């Protein structure tokens, strides 16, 4: 058996061949491949910024401006749904006093103001008057 195993080992040694292959150099630009993989992420972030973050920041600035410009005598709507008239504006502690009924006043934070309804009404009346003026001028010219 030992002679048989030696013959098998000799046959196995004879059958091992090493094939040589031609090596072709592949040029890769690592900078370019890195940029192409980053491009979609940059585009997604840009879309996210312009569709979500920028409008939200704009609304926040408008709201801060609205709250800072509230004056005594204006009708306001609070975030809890209470309508009232501003009777006192305190600049130093960011509070306002709102009269919600005759001789019923509440203290609230300026940040609780959602809308200044007296200004909204003025804008609505102006728009309505402009529409009426356009209809009247259109009827006169006919």
UniProtKB/Swiss-Prot annotation:
The record's listing under Pfam families reads:
YajC
The protein's name:
Sec translocon accessory complex subunit YajC
- Provide the protein's localization: Cell inner membrane
Biological process GO annotation list? protein transport
- Domain of life of the organism in this record? Bacteria
Q: Report how it sits in the membrane.
A: Single-pass membrane protein
Q: Which InterPro entries does the entry mention? A: Preprotein_translocase_YajC
Gene Ontology CC entries for this record: plasma membrane
Please give the function described in this protein's UniProt entry. The SecYEG-SecDF-YajC-YidC holo-translocon (HTL) protein secretase/insertase is a supercomplex required for protein secretion, insertion of proteins into membranes, and assembly of membrane protein complexes. While the SecYEG complex is essential for assembly of a number of proteins and complexes, the SecDF-YajC-YidC subcomplex facilitates these functions.
Organism of this sequence:
Rickettsia felis (strain ATCC VR-1525 / URRWXCal2) (Rickettsia azadi)
Q: What is its main location?
A: membrane
Entry coiled-coil feature ranges? none
Instruction: Name the family the entry cites.
Output: Belongs to the YajC family.
Lipoprotein: present as a keyword of the record? no
């Amino acid at each position: 058996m030992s002679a048989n195993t030696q013959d098998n080992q000799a046959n196995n040694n004879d059958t091992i061949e090493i094939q040589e292959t031609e090596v072709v150099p592949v040029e890769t630009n690592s900078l370019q491949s890195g940029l192409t993989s980053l491009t979609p992420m940059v585009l997604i972030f840009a879309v996210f910024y312009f569709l979500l973050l920028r409008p939200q920041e704009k609304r926040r600035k408008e709201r801060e401006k609205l709250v800072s410009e509230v004056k005594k005598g204006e009708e306001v709507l609070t975030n809890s749904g209470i309508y009232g008239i501003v009777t006192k504006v305190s600049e130093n502690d960011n509070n306002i006093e709102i009269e919600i009924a005759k001789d019923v006043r509440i203290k609230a934070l300026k940040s609780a103001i959602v809308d200044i309804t007296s200004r909204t009404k003025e804008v609505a009346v102006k728009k309505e008057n402009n529409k009426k003026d356009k209809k009247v001028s259109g009827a006169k010219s006919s």
